[in-house]
Structures are given as structure tokens and as C-alpha cells.
Amino acid sequence: MFTAKLIKGKTYNVMGITFRAGVSQTVPKKLYEYLNENPYFILTQELNNQKDDPINYTESELKGMNKAEHESIISNLGRNPSDFKNADERIAYILKQIDNKGE
């Protein structure tokens, strides 16, 4: 699993993903390699025996997250976080996407 965290600036958009300052996001290997020499990011690679399966969140886990974490997940799912008015809409969208990927 590869993660990237923006450490300079407020937001940074690359390859359709919007990063917000101080929020770590899981990124594909291609983006990880692209950002490798970028001083605006801290990158980490976690080695484990799991496949690159998408992470599944429960409703209670999502309710425990803050707005920035919801927005990060929504960006990774390919949507614009500003399309959602409140936490309930963000959580409903994320859960729907998780259900759709499981089918």
C-alpha cells in the first residue's frame, strides 16, 4: 500500500486526486512513483501480504471520521467532495460505492 501526505500548501490536485494539507491518502503505485521526487509530499510504502484490495469502511467507522477524511475517500473514488452538502451525504455515497464494488 502506498500513501502520500501533502506537507506544503493547502491543496494539490494531480491525476484527478485532490490532496489536502496534513491528510494522508492511499494512492496507486503509478501516482506514488510520480510524486516520489516532489518535496511537497511525504510518501510511505507499507509492505504487507495483502493484495491491493480496496479498503472497506463500516458506517460507524465513517461516522467517526472528520470531513477531510471523507473528502479524501470521495476524491479517491473519483468524485468532487464539494458535490456533497453534509456528512450524511458523504457517508451515504461512500457506502454505496463500497456496496457497488462488492457486487
UniProtKB/Swiss-Prot annotation:
SUPFAM superfamilies: PriA/YqbF domain (SSF160059), Rho N-terminal domain-like (SSF68912)
Lineage: superkingdom: Bacteria
InterPro entries: Rho_N_sf, YqbF_dom_sf, YqbF_HeH, YqbF_N
Pfam family, one: YqbF_HeH
Stated name of the protein: Uncharacterized protein YqbF
